[in-house]
Amino acid sequence: MNTDEHRYKRGVLSVFICVHLWLIFLSGCSRYAEFTLPPASGGDPDLTFAFDALPEPVLSRGQGWDSGDVLNPSVIRHDDQLLNYYSGFDGHTWHTGRATSSDGIHWQRQGKLLSPDPSTWEGSYIAANGAVLEWQGRVWYWYVGGPKTHPQIGLNGRVVLPTGPYLSWDEIGVSDPYVIRIAPYFYLYYTGLDRGRRQRLGVARSADGVHWEKLRTNPILAPGDPGSFDENGLGEPAVWQSHGFYWMLDTGRDIAENRRLGLARSLDGVHWTKLPAIFQGTQSWDSKAICDPTVLVDGDTIRVWFGGGDVASPDENLHGQIGYGTLRPVNATLQK
């Protein structure tokens, strides 16, 4: 081998090593893939929803661990009852509790289930804001843990969805998991936070609920223009399938930190279109915030539990309580 060939091959090898290491650095601890959800059948393009909520909360603040806020409901049907895994704030720390109900309106508290472990990745601030799902006879609960400045998503005491790599859209935090299952995958919708403190939405998928690959083209939904209901950020997605589409409720924050729910629609679960419908609190107890939706399609009824508060705040101390309503399909053209 002559000197020029040797230099050339060493140069190619050096470039390969540098590029390989850079790709590893960019990938962080997460895997990435291109995917969509199974295509929806499509439905009436003029279909939208109206929201009919009960005037009073269905789960109010308690004593001790959930005396500050009661928010972030996640509801499933289990046997002959409903289970609600919700977040309680005691003024310093977020915990997860559980309540049960036969009708989704009258709830019985079962106590606190989960608190952060300061000796682990969870830190001392949060072990809540989760997503519950029943699969193969077991109840799975993905939750947010970690310090307030760097949240991650965990399952059974370990991080399963970490933050993204340097300068990525979810570098600073991932939170607000919402998990659905469409065989053979789980799909996890979540909020990502970048170093500019912008909140956007993304999706990941997993074959086992533990090992996730993020969508390479995340984020899938971003805040709106100045003056919009979600100009200051959006998060807390809730996704379901009905009427020929995938639908999403998400929480938008305006410049004054009032929170309202927005509605979006998709044919593949990845490419979303925001719809004009915006749902806001109509009572004194949820006058400043309506947030944290969870959706249960129960026969022909689309049931929604949500958090509400009378204080405008981006995170806690809302005087938070949990409300209930239903989504009623309507024709957008006839509403005009």
Q: Where are the model-predicted features located?
A:
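Intrinsic disorder/low-complexity segments
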Residues: M1-A33, T333-K336
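Beta-rich carbohydrate-recognition and catalytic domains
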Residues: C29-G235, W240-K288, V297-K336
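Predominantly extracellular/luminal carbohydrate-interaction, adhesion, and secreted-enzyme modules
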Residues: C291
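Conserved active-site neighborhood of enzyme catalytic/cofactor-binding cores
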Residues: T294
